[in-house]
Amino acid sequence: MSIQSSEIIETIKMVADQNFDVRTITIGIDLHDCISADIDQLNQNIYQKITTIGKDLVETAKILSAKYGIPIVNQRISVTPIAQIAAATKADSYVSIAQTLDRAAKAIGVSFIGGFSALVQKGMSPSDEVLIRSIPEAMQTTDIVCSSINIGSTRAGINMDAVKLAGETIKRTADITPEGFGCAKIVVFCNAVEDNPFMAGAFHGSGEADAIINVGVSGPGVVKEALENSNATTLTEVAEVVKKTAFKITRVGELIGQEAAKMLNIPFGILDLSLAPTPAVGDSVARILEAMGLSVCGTHGTTAALALLNDAVKKGGMMASSSVGGLSGAFIPVSEDEGMIAAAESGILTLDKLEAMTAVCSVGLDMIAVPGKTPAHTISGIIADEAAIGMINSKTTAVRIIPVTGKDVGESVEFGGLLGYAPIMPVKEGSCEVFVNRGGRIPAPVQSMKN
């Protein structure tokens, strides 16, 4: 394949001026062969396997970054959901396992480790319940462990007992971690995917290989710049510009993933196409939507613009790689997107509008700060609403919500780094307590009649 000099310059500009980077190289590790009835032995086995397989990940990322001139921001590990791995111990707490994950991840130098997780879309085993009840203390006593709960799916419906427990767990975590920061490391899913490289929702699915490389790219700034420099007038032309730009972004991610797999001698799994923003100016999904013609993200037309963006990214990415997977779309994390932050502060981007946007984008209600006084049943109601969108539309949806103790609407909270900062957003005054407390399961939807 011949490469034009203009294409080389274009790639250099993507990195130098438009905040393009490979957001993460994530190694997924299967822990089934670590299982032991003795929790101390289990912890020892887990530590040994993670540090053995992941020991060269950080150094490999540095070598590839230097070789190709592409920043590789994070190196991460995802593991088999711990509720499955720890069941044989019959322990009443899995906090020590979270602490083992934390130690192992720090020993090899990665930025996060995911998989302190439970899959409870149809029901909770005793081990699932122990894990979920361990989450608050696990988040309090670890630094880089991430947790997730899958509470629903299109085939199983929504487990409302798990939704209720998830709301209580998030509320408890907010109460015992500074400014609710522990909640930034907890995601509640409907239709969770098994090969997600992004945190905080990554875990290594049971259908995966013993170890696998998954890569996530990030290029909102590149897409925005392409739109601003194009002659596109109609939305058809806008979609074409986004599609072609996504192709270029994806090719870089594919190259890095294949090279990393070769160097680490671990199979290449998937490339996640998701446009992942940061709080930096020029790296915002919201600003892409505004470049399409919206005065501010959150105004009328925002959901349509996001649908166009999400679909065009997928179409361009699928042409560039045969290994597309994960979540693959556009993320809309409020605290991690400079444009979303500004729109939320202006009052135009609301929780209701974000919920509508999640019906057409990559994941769901992400990194949203709410008043610390928000009751657990309200959090559960928000989770149930979001799960319903995912269940009915056969897509992944998720909630990462942070009740900030001691703060109310009009104030903001600073998380720092990639997590950014967020204005406290209002929640509805009415109560869903009776509804949430009913428990049971919302049945899976009929598939033949789609309206």
Curated annotation (Swiss-Prot):
- SUPFAM superfamilies xref list: PFL-like glycyl radical enzymes
Show the Gene3D superfamilies listed in the entry.
3.20.70.20
Family annotation (Pfam families): DUF711
HAMAP family registered for this protein in UniProt: UPF0210
> NCBIfam families annotated for this entry?
PRK05313.1
Q: How does it assemble?
A: Homodimer.
Q: Which PANTHER family match?
A: UPF0210 PROTEIN MJ1665, UPF0210 PROTEIN SPR0218
Q: Which family does it belong to?
A: Belongs to the UPF0210 family.
Q: What is this protein called?
A: UPF0210 protein APP7_1551
